[in-house]
Amino acid sequence: RDCLLSRGLGDVYKRQYKDADASKRVRIHSSKESYDILKTFYEDCMQHHEECWAMYLNGAGRLLGVSCVSRSGMNSTVVDIRIVLQTALVSHASGIILSHNHPSGSTVASTPDNNLTSQLKKGCEAIGIQLLDHIILTEDAYLSYMDEGML
């Protein structure tokens, strides 16, 4: 589960389902399903430091892969949206679900969280990829930008 920052961007696609039949890929139907899948990637950091992971989906909503796009400090993480978008292009994704954790346990979106979402949405629109959701995770709860009408 190494971060895919500047190298190996295609590894996420190769590692997740490259040879799998499309019908065997997990289909994401809800933010709860996204949370349940994503939470497993945050096991080592949920209460210690922030990380940002992205899920990449095909046009049918089936999971192509999951990639760590940033690991940072206790209260914030820096996300380069170009990395998120590049990985989406390499994996031939039609949609992205961005996520990050709040070690504080709060599911309240911050101004930087909102700014990141806005910037990523603009980037996605420019290249024909849909930002499907941005999920803020804690140990026992989550906030979905889509569910809250914030996307």
Task: Name these PLM-found stretches.
Residues 1-13:
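Single conserved hydrophobic/aromatic residue that forms the stacking wall/gate
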Residues 5, 48-50, 92:
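Residue-level preference for short coil/turn positions at secondary-structure junctions
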Residues 15, 58-60, 70-151:
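Active-site-proximal loop/helix of nucleotide/amide-processing enzymes and allied scaffolds
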